Curated annotation (Swiss-Prot):
Keywords: Coiled coil, Endoplasmic reticulum, Membrane, Metal-binding, Transmembrane, Transmembrane helix, Zinc, Zinc-finger. Residues 95-130 form a coiled coil. One of its GO terms (molecular function) is zinc ion binding. Signal peptide: none annotated. Residues 67-69 are lumenal. It is a multi-pass membrane protein. It is found in: Endoplasmic reticulum membrane. The chain crosses the membrane at residues 46-66, 70-90. Residues 176-190 have a biased composition (Pro residues). Residues 146-209, 314-393 are annotated as: Disordered. Endoplasmic reticulum (ER)-shaping membrane protein that plays a role in determining ER morphology. Involved in the stabilization of nascent three-way ER tubular junctions within the ER network. May also play a role as a curvature-stabilizing protein within three-way ER tubular junction network. This is Endoplasmic reticulum junction formation protein lunapark-A.
Length: 393
C-alpha cells in the first residue's frame, strides 16, 4: 500500500530540492559560527574563574593556614603548582572537542555544497535557458558575479576629450578561396593636395570622401567600403614605441649597445599627456614633436648649440670678393730709377701745367683688358737718358 501511495506522490522539483539544500547549508553555517563563539566563551570563562579561584585560595592559605614545617609547606604549595597545569589541560580539551564538532559540521557542509553544485550542473544541461537563468540567479549568485566581472572591461573607461578622437580599425572578414580585390585608383582631382601618411586629415580629403562613400549596387548597408587615401588621424609618432616583450638576444644587444627603455626618455604631450614614443638621452632635450592624438606642437626644451665659423672661410671670402685689384697691383712693372746727372740739382723736375703726365699711369683707370704698360715703352740706353735730362734742364 505504501508503494502505491509513493508512486502517486509527485517528485520534488529542482527548485524545491535546491531550497532544501540551501536551508540545510544555512543551518550548518550558523551552527559552525555558533560553535566558534561558544569555544571562545567557554575558554574565556575557564580562564577568568580559574584565575579568581587561584587568587582567593592563595589569600586564604597565606592569611589563616601556613604550616611551620618545610614538608607541610611543600604539601600546601603543591596544589598551587598543579592548578595552572590543570587549567591548561582543560582548555586544550575544550578546543579539541569543539574542533571535532566543527570538522563534522564542515564535512556535512561540503557534502551539501557538492550536491548543490551537481544539481546546478544538471540544471544547466537539462533545463531551458530561461529556467536555468532564473535558477542560477536565485541559488548561485557567485557564478553570476563572476560572469559580470568577466564581461566588464578591466580598467577605467577612456572618454575622448574635445578635439581628440579614438582610432578604431574596421576589419572586414575576407571570404576564403577568393583572391583579394585589386584597388583601382579613382580619378584624381587636379589642384587637391595629397596628405602625407599619418598626417592630420586635410580639407581635400573631406571633399573627396562623399564621392568615394557612394554605396555600390549589391553591397549591404552595414559593410564598410574601403576608401583610397584614408588613414588614421594624427601625425606619426616622433619615435617608435619599443616592444614590451623582448627576448634574451635583444636584452644582450641592448646591454652591449647601451640602448633600451631604461636608457630612453618618454615623449609626453604637454596638452593631453599622451605617450608619443621614446627618445634617446642625447636628443631628448633638443627634439620637437607634434602629438599624434591632439596635434599639439611640443617645442624643444633647449636649442641645439651651433659651432662658430672658422676664420679660414672668412679670409677666403674676402679674397674671392676683390681679385682684380690684387692682380693689377702684382702686374704693374717696377721701372728702374733714372740716373741723375752731375749738373742736375737736388730739386725734382716739375712738369708744366699744360704738359700731360705721361710717366704716371693711375691704377684706377686701368682695366683688365688694357695692354700692360711695359710692353709699349721702349728701352733707352744710358746716353739717351742723359741727353733727355739735359734737354729738360
Amino acid at each position: 500500500m505504501g508503494a502505491v501511495v509513493s508512486r502517486w506522490r509527485a517528485k520534488p522539483s529542482t527548485v524545491e530540492v535546491l531550497e532544501g539544500l540551501d536551508k540545510d547549508i544555512q543551518v550548518l553555517e550558523e551552527y559552525r559560527e555558533k560553535n566558534h563563539k561558544q569555544l571562545k566563551l567557554w575558554v574565556y570563562r575557564l580562564l577568568l574563574y580559574s584565575a579568581l579561584l587561584y587568587l582567593m585560595a592563595c589569600a586564604v592559605v597565606y592569611a589563616w593556614y601556613i604550616p611551620e614545617r618545610m614538608i607541610g609547606k611543600l604539601i600546601v604549595a603543591s596544589p598551587f603548582l598543579l592548578f595552572p597545569l590543570l587549567i591548561w589541560l582543560l582548555r586544550k580539551l575544550l578546543i579539541i572537542l569543539y574542533n571535532k564538532r566543527t570538522e563534522r559540521n564542515n564535512e556535512k557542509l561540503e557534502e551539501l555544497k557538492a550536491e548543490k553544485k551537481k544539481i546546478l550542473e544538471q540544471v544547466m544541461e537539462t533545463e531551458t535557458y530561461k529556467n536555468a537563468k532564473l535558477i542560477l540567479e536565485r541559488f548561485d549568485p557567485d557564478s553570476k558575479k563572476k560572469l559580470e566581472l568577466e564581461t566588464q572591461p578591466i580598467g577605467p573607461t577612456v572618454t575622448p576629450r574635445q578635439g581628440q578622437e579614438l582610432r578604431h580599425r574596421l576589419v572586414s572578414p575576407r571570404p576564403t578561396g577568393r583572391p583579394p580585390p585589386v584597388p583601382v585608383p579613382g580619378p584624381s582631382v587636379p589642384g587637391t593636395p595629397l596628405s602625407a601618411p599619418g598626417g592630420p586629415p586635410e580639407k581635400g580629403l573631406s571633399a573627396s570622401t562623399p564621392q568615394a562613400l557612394i554605396r555600390r549596387p549589391g553591397t549591404p548597408v552595414g559593410t564598410p567600403i574601403p576608401v583610397m587615401g584614408m588613414h588614421p588621424p594624427g601625425p606619426p609618432l616622433a619615435r617608435p614605441v619599443l616592444p614590451r616583450e623582448r627576448g634574451a638576444v635583444d636584452r644582450v644587444i641592448e646591454y652591449l649597445v647601451g640602448d633600451g627603455p631604461q636608457n630612453r626618455y618618454a615623449l609626453i604631450c604637454q596638452q593631453c599627456l599622451s605617450h608619443n614614443g621614446m627618445a634617446l638621452k642625447e636628443e631628448f632635450e633638443y627634439i620637437a614633436f607634434r602629438c599624434a592624438y591632439c596635434y599639439f606642437l611640443n617645442p624643444a626644451r633647449k636649442t641645439r648649440p651651433q659651432a662658430p665659423r672658422l676664420p679660414e672661410f672668412a679670409a677666403e671670402a674676402k679674397t674671392s670678393q676683390d681679385p682684380p685689384a690684387v692682380a693689377m697691383e702684382t702686374d704693374l712693372p717696377v721701372s728702374p730709377p733714372a740716373p741723375e746727372s752731375k749738373e742736375a740739382g737736388p730739386e725734382p723736375v716739375k712738369a708744366g701745367d699744360g704738359d700731360p703726365q705721361t710717366d704716371e699711369i693711375p691704377t684706377e683707370e686701368m682695366k683688365p683688358g688694357d695692354p700692360e704698360p711695359h710692353t709699349d715703352i721702349p728701352d733707352k740706353s744710358d746716353g739717351e737718358q742723359d741727353v733727355s735730362a739735359m734737354e729738360v734742364e
